[in-house]
Design a protein with these regions (language model features):
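Hydrophobic-face positions in mid-chain alpha helices that act as interaction patches
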Residues: 4-13, 17-18, 174, 198-292
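Conserved, well-structured interaction surfaces
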Residues: 35-112, 143, 161-168, 292
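Extended ligand-binding groove/face enriched in aromatic
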Residues: 95-99, 103-135
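TPR/Sel1-like alpha-solenoid repeat signature
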Residues: 98, 181-188, 200
Length: 292
């Protein structure tokens, strides 16, 4: 239950907020309506982006989803000692729980907190933290950005220590030592601690340095599948496909962005698909179950 399911829409509108897409009147024949108004607030960077043209609210599932997974991680962390099993198995599960909590808070602080700057982090706003394993009515205050990153780092270090100790061999569908190193490299990159980011990235490469030769793929093939040796951890496919599936006629891939790649760049025919004359993201098929 602590893992994010692949039918959960969390980051639906993030791509709309980048320069990677453009907007236009819907020309996709399968979807008759023009739904640009649904993503207007995000595309135009409005103060309250969840509001549509009509005044209706878009569902923001990230807040609810991540905090619900944090609650499950809290239960595992606080109550695992009462469970049956070997100490090694418990330690490994505990390492996964600390990873998931760190991951969820890291995603939340980047969605709802301010960008990390060391000089202002002790005053900038971060996010609320909950370490209780039961639900009760109370108000949680937002921690500073510095404190938010400190708490995430604490969980991340505990996760790495436990997963290094157990060092279980796992599939990409379970959190592993390599996945923890990867999250640490991303965490320190965002914190602008580049030496630590490089150090953990090097640790990832000692475990898996395989590259996927996308030049061998056809236009019908997808990049993120079980055959891709670069994937270290995966938990579903929904976020990869939702924008392309639901908004392809209104928010296609930006032609300026697409044309910035060399004509012979294999990414132009593997990461992007031509669908009814519109360029859409084509990283994975809806039934691949891969989102790494």
């Amino acid at each position: 239950e602590g893992y994010i399911r692949n039918n959960t829409s969390i980051h639906t509108y993030l791509d709309i907020m980048t320069d990677d897409v453009e907007e236009k009147a819907n020309t996709w024949p399968v979807m008759q309506s023009d739904i640009r108004g649904d993503g207007y607030g995000y595309f135009c960077w409005q103060p309250n982006p969840e509001y549509r043209f009509t005044g209706a609210l878009n569902a923001d599932n990230a807040w609810e989803t991540y905090y619900s997974k944090i609650l499950i991680a809290n239960n595992v962390i606080d109550l695992l000692d009462d469970a049956e099993g070997t100490q090694s198995d418990k330690d490994d599960l505990l390492g996964e729980a600390y990873f998931l909590r760190a991951y969820c808070y890291f995603m939340l602080v980047n969605l709802y907190g301010e960008p990390y700057e060391k000089e202002s982090a002790d005053k900038a706003l971060g996010i609320p933290f909950n370490y209780e394993h039961s639900v009760r009515e109370r108000t949680y205050k937002r921690e500073t950005l510095a404190r938010s990153y400190e708490l995430i780092e604490n969980d991340l270090k505990k996760s790495i220590h436990l997963l290094e100790t157990t060092d279980y061999t796992k599939t990409v569908f379970r959190i592993s030592k390599g996945a923890a190193y990867l999250l640490a490299s991303r965490f320190y990159l965002y914190k602008k601690d580049y030496e630590q980011a490089i150090s953990y990235a090097d640790k990832v490469l000692t475990i898996n340095s395989a590259l996927y030769d996308i030049r061998t793929l056809t236009e019908e093939d997808y990049v993120f599948t079980k055959e891709n040796p670069e994937i270290i951890w995966t938990y579903g496919d929904y976020e990869v496909n939702y924008l392309s599936a639901a908004y392809r006629g209104c928010f296609p891939v930006s032609m300026a962005f697409y044309n910035s790649f060399h004509a012979n760049d294999a990414r132009k025919r593997t990461y992007v698909k031509d669908d009814w004359g519109d360029l859409i993201v084509g990283k994975g098929a809806a039934n691949t179950g891969v989102y790494g």
